[in-house]
Amino acid sequence: MATITAGMVKELRETTGVGMMDCKQALSENDGNMEAAIDWLRKKGLSKAAKKAGRVAAEGLIGALTDGKKGVVVEVNSETDFVARNEQFQGLVKMIAQVALKVGDDIDAINAAPVGSVTVATAIADAIATIGENMTLRRAKLLSVENGVVASYVHGAVVEGAGKLGVLVALESTGKTDELALLGRQIAMHVAAANPQALDAASLDPELIRREKDVMADKYRQQGKPEAMIEKIVENGLKTFYKEVCLLEQAFIHDTGKSVAQAVKEAEGKVGAPIKVAAFVRYALGEGIEKQTSDFAAEVAAVSGQK
């Protein structure tokens, strides 16, 4: 039997929004397995979480930069939000994005790349020494197309091209680049707001689909539905699930009467050529990094019977 720690209960509560005692029971029933505990809570009707959500807990900035047919998004973390408002740090993030646009999204390659008379890694070290706070280049992603545009959107920008959330959208087309760029930015804004998990159903993690089907089937079995009916219900449920998590099937935020795929198809008239949404990337600052919260940890520890 796995030991259920206060940190595990805290993480599950933050992910699902379910009460601490239910979270502790879910973890106990599933031998400490976080994903299984989430599914257990969902089957009990206590949580609607589709999967473990990354909790935004780190500070710093997301930088996004595009240059026609390619674009890059980077995350540079700091210890406090105060540093994110520092002009030197903001300049560092934008410089790293410029370098990544040239050398690609491999972190080692970015750190080793020259910038002036030093490397990026040295520039980061110098900023740490000057500002007095630890910083790190956490991740980067480059998108490019042979024909078309890569558009970007930064939400909560504190300076041009840098903020709390950054999105890139790659559109493949031989049509008018100005119209493509406008559509790309609209889709990027949609991605920022709707947070799709995949481009389409075929791009979804098969394990995620399997889990979703399992949760739905078990839920309806508990309601006493006959097996012959459950299969059809689950099939319809998956269609709804896809509309919630797949970019092309989501209702377009700029016109909720149509899907993103339909909006793209309609835009082909203005663009003058077929359009394919080739890829997207969405970086939210600190997702997956957990900040220490001592008061809440103490509360959880008390419920868990730990000191």
UniProtKB/Swiss-Prot annotation:
Compartments (UniProt record): Cytoplasm
Involved in Mg(2+) ion dislocation from EF-Tu as annotated region, ranges: 80-83
Pfam families xref list: EF_TS
Coiled coil regions, renumbered to chain: none
UniProt keywords, alphabetically: Cytoplasm, Elongation factor, Protein biosynthesis
Molecular-function GO terms, alphabetical: translation elongation factor activity
SUPFAM superfamilies in the record: Elongation factor Ts (EF-Ts), dimerisation domain, UBA-like
Keyword Protein biosynthesis: yes
Record carries keyword Ribonucleoprotein: no
Domain of life: Bacteria
Cellular component annotations (GO), alphabetically ordered: cytoplasm
Gene3D superfamilies in UniProt: 1.10.286.20, DNA helicase RuvA subunit, C-terminal domain, Elongation factor Ts, dimerisation domain
Stored NCBIfam families: tsf
Record-linked HAMAP family: EF_Ts
Function: Associates with the EF-Tu.GDP complex and induces the exchange of GDP to GTP. It remains bound to the aminoacyl-tRNA.EF-Tu.GTP complex up to the GTP hydrolysis stage on the ribosome.
Family label: Belongs to the EF-Ts family.
Name by which UniProt lists this protein: Elongation factor Ts
Origin species: Rhodopseudomonas palustris (strain BisA53)
Source organism phylogeny: Bacteria, Pseudomonadati, Pseudomonadota, Alphaproteobacteria, Hyphomicrobiales
